[in-house]
Structure formats: C-alpha cells, structure tokens
Amino acid sequence: MSKIGLVLEGGGMKCAYTAGILDAMMDNGVTFDYCIGVSAGSANGVSFVAGQRGRNIRFYTEHINEKGYFGLSSFLKTGNLFGLQYIYGTLTNSGGADPLDFDAFMKSPMEYWLVATDAQTGKPTYFSKKDMHKDDYRHVMASCAIPAACRPVEIDGRFYYDGGVSDSIPVQDRKSVV
C-alpha cells in the first residue's frame, strides 16, 4: 500500500509561510504517513510531527529578533551567521524558551526524515527520528547549516551542511528512506 507523505522544502523565510500552512493542517486534523524536511523545512517538520501548533511561526516572528538567532553577534561568537546552537539548543532543548516536545515527536505515528549534505562527499544523507535524541538536535542543525554562512555540523565523526545543497526537494529518493 502506498504511503502519503509531506515534503517540506527549505528557503528560510519562505518557511514562515509553510509554518502557517502546517498550523492550519493541525487545526484540521490533517496528518500524513511520513514527513521529510530539508533545511528550514526540517525544523518545521519536527514541530509538525510533534503536534506543536504555533511553535514554528514563533521562530520566524518572535525568536528571530533575539540576539543569538542571526547576525554579526552570532557570527563573531560562534562562526555561524545563523545561531544554530542558540536556535536548536538554547531555545529548543527541554529547559529552553520554546522547547520541542520530544516525547510527542517520538510517539507520533508519523515517520520523520531530514536531509543533510555530507561535507566530504557532497551527497545527501537521510536521518530519521530514530537518529535523534532529546536535547541533541544536531541533525536539524546540520540540515540548516548553509555553507559559508555556517560551519559544518559534526555527527558521529562526519561533517554535514544544509541538505538543500544536495537534495533541495527530497522527492526522488524518498522511496529509499520510507
């Protein structure tokens, strides 16, 4: 039997629009068998799978104005124009200002995948929610780490960049991961 999936592309602020659509889907009980995200779409997907209505849009409308989120201050402190550790660590971890409901994310029957680009090979790597751990969101960081604007993110001894570099709309290879 075929599975029905949701593919969430990246694109930074374009994903603010997607965040509103995802909230409308949650309001109307729309679900999928799986969700696969790339770049900022991977972050939107995590909140959608967890059922956290409103969480995504807060990152694009409220948190974006915070000092550690984006800009010269973040770049000078971390080497990243986007404060990936601030966004997916300080804000997202259990004690953060806008924590991911990791238990709901893991318990959701919806499968979840994200794409990151292997910095050495340039090939896409697909991670599932089974690869993720509470308060360790390096997989999402990796999927969002834009080359030249961010340093690569290390996971298990390998370095990764934004998944959009190698598979910007992960439709063709979805059969290999689902």
Briefly describe each language-model feature range.
Residues 1-38, 46-178:
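Patatin-like phospholipase
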